[in-house]
Amino acid sequence: MAGKQNQAAPKKAVAPRQQHYEFGGPIGAFGITFGLPILVHVFNLFCNDISGCPAPSLLHPKSLDLAQLKREIGWPDNGVFGLFSWSATLWTLGYYALSLVQYRFLPGHHVEGTELSTGGRLKYKLNAFNSAMCTLAILAAGTIAQGAEFPVWTFISDNFAQIISANILFAFALAIFVYVRSFDVKPGNKDMRQLAAGGVTGSLIYDFYIGRELNPRITLPLIGQVDIKEFMEMRPGLLGWIILNCAFIAKQYRLYGYVTDSILFITAIQAFYVFDGIYMEPAVLTTMDITTDGFGFMLSFGDVVWVPFMYSTQTRYLSVHPQQLGAFGLIAVGAVLAAGYSIFRLSNSQKNNFRTNPEDPSVKHLTYLQTKTGSRLITSGWWGIARHINYLGDWLQSWPYSLPTGIAGYQILSAGSNAPGAITMLDGREVVQGEARGWGIVFTYFYILYFAILLIHRDLRDDEKCSKKYGDDWEKYKKLVKWRIVPGIY
């Protein structure tokens, strides 16, 4: 169980109120808070397994008929209320309950986080990897016994929109809970609770979105104390992403009677990303998410809605429009992945070696700028190419998530259409690209665009932070290393 560490008494009261805004300030926070949940549903409805991706009517906006569009996207007869169901909500809550039970009873190890600005360190119980393996073992056993008809897989496919809604409601409820509870934070409290510097602007919607409390914790009956932010970041959403991918593999098999290499490839590399992250769970305790950002709707929604449901778009697409990459395709996409991974790992390794052992032969030759703060800013090697060359590697690794979908887009025709080049489902329906070819890229390649924006925003935050920390030295450094992420472009 997460615990408390009382090595040092809290020194300060709460974070001082400040008016520095990100994400477009209160207006941007309002738009994101209420716009992104709609966008997640739009992606599911407009790229569907009923009529196509995108829905055919969207290709002819001038003659768009709303009634026809509703039929094409499977809009519920009872309207928006049909996007909710008690069964999906209860099973979703059951999934969270299972995560909590695993957190409580599965073995793990206890570590301390970084020192808080108010003094002291929080303790964390880390067993996300064990929890994930336990859940996947249960799902594997069910799949071995019942194959693609395993009820978990069919329930996800049949209730996908309702599961999205259940998680959206949970994200809002959790964000409201921690926001209201954050006003109980008192100076010098024994639990070492504190407010996040960026979440006390005085704007209700902005602070609700960014998060007021830095490390909100809750004590639950039979479970004990849980660090909400660390728990949500490393458990239900990340594992849920892989569970959804597996559900779409099962769906492809039910629709066609086979599974393609493209959907397996995407699932494999995304699973590697997730398992690498949860296996290295202690590393998250030093990230900005844990040490600096408050826990609000941004992280609540991102953890349990945005990551699992938007990041699984490609496998959801391929479950309906199967693509075989073949040996050449797998090698080509794998090469992009290898290039990105190499840049990311080699650059980070070089920086880490330089910081921990600057006399190491592999980094001893590197030039650097000595700052007044005592830090050394590397100006050659990987870090002489761009100030965040590791971000370039990270971004390149996002491309293999989308490339296997090809020039995306498809239409679903009724059985017996006998369309040229059609892929026929087991129930006789036919899938063709037709005039939808290329338009599906809006959905399947969205992740690449989103991730680029995320990295650029992260770079801007880092630039501002370093400018305050290093002053004139940072300006000198930027003249020596001109490019931010992509040399010659940005």
Swiss-Prot record:
One of its GO terms (molecular function) is NADP binding. It is a multi-pass membrane protein. Keywords: Lipid biosynthesis, Lipid metabolism, Membrane, NADP, Oxidoreductase, Steroid biosynthesis, Steroid metabolism, Sterol biosynthesis, Sterol metabolism, Transmembrane, Transmembrane helix. GO terms for cellular component: endoplasmic reticulum membrane. Its EC number is 1.3.1.70. The keyword Iron-sulfur does not apply. GO terms for biological process: ergosterol biosynthetic process. NADP(+) binds at residues 351, 355, 378, 383, 390-391, 462, 466-470, 477. Pathway: Steroid biosynthesis; zymosterol biosynthesis; zymosterol from lanosterol: step 2/6. The chain crosses the membrane at residues 23-43, 80-100, 136-156, 160-180, 230-250, 255-275, 324-344, 436-456. It catalyses: 4,4-dimethyl-5alpha-cholesta-8,24-dien-3beta-ol + NADP(+) = 4,4-dimethyl-5alpha-cholesta-8,14,24-trien-3beta-ol + NADPH + H(+). It is found in: Membrane. Gene3D superfamilies: 1.20.120.1630. Reduces the C14=C15 double bond of 4,4-dimethyl-cholesta-8,14,24-trienol to produce 4,4-dimethyl-cholesta-8,24-dienol. This is Delta(14)-sterol reductase.
